[in-house]
Regions:
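Conserved glycine-rich Rossmann-like NAD(P)H-binding loop of the short-chain dehydrogenase/reductase
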Residues: 30-47
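Amphipathic alpha-helical dimer-interface segment in Rossmann-like NAD(P)H-dependent oxidoreductases
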Residues: 77, 120-138
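Catalytic Tyr-X3-Lys loop
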Residues: 87, 107-126, 141, 145, ...
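Conserved glycine-rich cofactor-binding loop
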Residues: 9, 16-18
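A glycine-rich helix->loop->beta "capping" turn
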Residues: 54-58, 78-91, 110
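Active-site Tyr-X3-Lys motif and surrounding loop/helix of classical short-chain dehydrogenase/reductase
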Residues: 74-81, 100-108, 112-119
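The beta1-alpha1 cofactor-binding region of Rossmann-like NAD(H)/NADP(H)-dependent oxidoreductases
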Residues: 41-42, 63-75, 111
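Catalytic loop of short-chain dehydrogenase/reductase
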Residues: 95-99, 111, 143-168
Length: 169
């Protein structure tokens, strides 16, 4: 399949494993160079080596925590510099291991856990999107893809993830 991604430059948050890793792999198979982002540097480096060997594309591992504006801004600037620009952002990051902090019956959920889940999934995606838009405007082309999903056993993350599309039109 040709998605017209040859020589495009992408960032995939949550790119060291799971859905993010699978998306990074497919973007690279379509000809994009990809910066994969997650918190764990060792996992990122192993995934980058694996995907680069599979796809013969440039895979750049960048450790960053999307709950930190400073880390997001640094990561996006570094990705743009190493890749030579930015065209695509895939927001697929979530809490470590894809789990949510705030779980269980509502009466047991504490605000700090709920806010942490929102800070990772929703506000983290917003931070990344805000940071990449100037680079996409410079390129004259860009796409932002938000990955969300419903997980009935983790109500906080289920509430946070659907909030993402509300600000994307």
């Amino acid at each position: 399949m040709d998605l017209g991604l040859q020589d495009k430059h992408a960032i995939v948050t949550g790119g060291s494993r799971g859905i993010g890793k699978a998306i990074a792999r497919e973007l690279a198979r379509e000809g994009a160079d990809v910066a994969i982002v997650a918190r764990n540097k060792a996992d990122l480096e192993a995934t980058a080596r694996e995907l680069a060997a599979e796809t013969n594309r440039r895979i750049v591992p960048l450790a960053a925590d999307v709950t930190s504006k400073e880390q997001v801004d640094r990561m996006v600037a570094e990705a743009a510099q190493q890749l030579g620009g930015l065209h695509i952002l895939v927001n697929s990051g979530s809490a470590p291991g894809g789990s949510a902090t705030a779980t269980g019956p509502i009466e047991t959920v504490i605000d700090e856990d709920l806010l942490q889940d929102f800070n990772v999934k929703y506000v983290g995606a917003l931070r990344c999107s805000r940071a990449v838009i100037p680079f996409m405007k410079t390129e004259g082309w860009g796409r932002i893809i938000n990955i969300s999903g419903g997980t009935p056993a983790t109500p906080a993350i289920s509430a946070a993830a659907p909030a993402m599309p509300a600000w994307c039109t």
